[in-house]
Regions:
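Charged, amphipathic alpha-helical segments
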Residues: 1-2, 33, 41-42, 50-56
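Asparagine-centered strand-capping/turn motif at beta-strand->loop junctions
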Residues: 2-10
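Short, structured beta-strand/loop micro-motifs enriched in basic residues and often containing a Trp
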Residues: 10-19
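Intrinsically disordered, low-complexity Pro/Gly/Ser/Thr-rich segments with frequent PxxP/GP/PP motifs
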Residues: 19-41
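Glycine- and charge-enriched low-complexity intrinsically disordered segments
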Residues: 45-95
C-alpha cells in the first residue's frame, strides 16, 4: 500500500496534522511515522504543507482534490497504529 513516511529531523517536537478532521500526532526528534490511506483507496496522492512546527497532510484519491480520503491510519516505525493525539506535549498547541 502507498504510504507517506514522515520523519522529524529537527530538535523539537513536530506536529503531524492530518486533514480533513485535524487529527494530530506528535513526533519527537528522530521519530518516523507513516500515514496510510484506508483499505481499497485507488492511487492515493499526498499533499504536504509545512508551517511553523507543523506538517499538514491531505490524502486524495487519484490526486483528485474533490475526492478527499478521510479514512487514514498513522503507524510508527514498528508498524504499530497510533492513537490521535499521540505524544501530545503538555502546553503545546498544534496551531
Amino acid at each position: 500500500m502507498n504510504g507517506l513516511p514522515v520523519r522529524n529531523g529537527g530538535d523539537d517536537v513536530l506536529c503531524l496534522f492530518l486533514e480533513p478532521y485535524g487529527d494530530v500526532f506528535w513526533l519527537k526528534p528522530g521519530d518516523e511515522f507513516t500515514v496510510l490511506p484506508g483499505e481499497g483507496v485507488p492511487d492515493p496522492q499526498f499533499t504536504v504543507e509545512m508551517v511553523k512546527h507543523r506538517l499538514i497532510v491531505w490524502v486524495f484519491e487519484g490526486g483528485d482534490p474533490a475526492k478527499v480520503v478521510v479514512d487514514c491510519t498513522v503507524v510508527d516505525s514498528g508498524g504499530n497504529e497510533l492513537p490521535e493525539g499521540h505524544q501530545w506535549p503538555d502546553g503545546r498547541s498544534p496551531y
